[in-house]
A protein has these predicted regions:
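Ubiquitin system architectures
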Residues: 1-86
Length: 86
């Protein structure tokens, strides 16, 4: 079975009532994904989210480790990744 190059996932921040469909590199590290998400949220909300530096990403029922990649975390097309304040 070939590994996918990209993964289509929905990133949801329910606290701010926003969900973003994203096509992401399968080997993207969770730490880099957090930075990308925070950048998007800051652009939408005009510089807010400075207190979210220590946010966490949740997939299924577990908090994702910063050193994992999307692929190693078991995230596949159609996955929902939740953003939460930690």
């Amino acid at each position: 079975m070939n590994e996918p190059e990209n993964i289509l996932a929905t990133v949801e921040c329910s606290e701010k009532k926003i969900a973003i469909d994203m096509e992401l590199p399968a080997k993207l590290q969770i730490e880099d994904l957090k930075m990308k998400i925070l950048e998007i949220l800051r652009n939408i909300y005009a510089g807010l989210f400075t207190d979210w530096e220590s946010c966490c990403l949740i997939y299924g029922n577990r908090i994702l480790n910063d050193s994992e990649t999307l692929l190693s975390a078991g995230i596949y097309d159609g996955g929902y990744i939740y953003v939460a304040r930690s």
